[in-house]
Amino acid sequence: SATALELFHNFALIHDDIEDSSEMRRGSQTLHRIHGIPLAINAGDALHGIVHQVLLENHEKLGAQKALQVHQHLNLVMQKTFEGQALDIGWVEKEVFPNREQYQQMIVRKTGWYSGRGPCQCGALIAGKEGELFESLGDFGESLGIGFQIRDDILNLTESSESSAPEAQVGGYGKEQGGDFAEGKRTLITIEMLERLNPEEQNRLQSILLKARTEVKEEEIVWAVEQSERCGALDAARSEAQNHAQRASSELSKMPQGSPRKILEGLLGFLAEDRKV
């Protein structure tokens, strides 16, 4: 089950990088940059097929009924993730700037399900836990996943470049510091910025986000990163990440003591670290 979840994760990232025209992933060039879009799409499709094969083989360890439950739940996770991705891509394609409520609907589906709720609830199904504990694990995972995503968005603006190689750069900048601006990402940070900047600054930020990635200049990224700190958008995002950590902690407190809870506490501890990111 864990293998299937990780294979799905990698399949989704391959396609996500193509859809976002991303240049870098985990410090290296994205698959489609190395092998081209057609082969990368095919690799993602192949992983998708392997996911279901792995889940079908689950009956040998879990029994037919439990294996079917896990398979059905992971299918739901995929569906929710694709719904969230459709919202995210649609905003960029249609030049839409979402409000906070719309962003929440997207992030719950795109990130909350596949990175948190889905894995936690799959574990609950395997352990034969249903009812209140099943829901609490899902709520814990959702808050944890969204919190991690917000921290990742913050790190995108505060961390130094992953690579200074020419091939990692697009429009003078790549998927390094501020890469989300180059890709036109609609994140919690951009929503906060558009609420806090003056009209002239709002127009400039929107014009950057609407540009093709290859047209975004380095000085525009530098300006946007500086404004995110100056206007308080980064601090607001840090606060929201902490709110999600607190929600996750509240759900975790409902779970029985033991080694599984300690593992989850370790994940939560990283998210709840009171440090600037």
Where are the predicted features?
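Mg2+-dependent prenyl diphosphate-binding active-site environment of isoprenoid biosynthetic enzymes
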Residues: 1-202, 243, 265, 269
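A short structural micro-motif
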Residues: 77, 143, 211-215, 230, ...
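Short, contiguous acidic/charged loop-to-helix segments that flank catalytic cores in large enzymes
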Residues: 176-180, 235, 255
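Mobile late-domain/C-terminal helix-loop "cap" segments
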Residues: 197-253
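Short, amphipathic C-terminal "tail helix"
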Residues: 242-244, 249-277
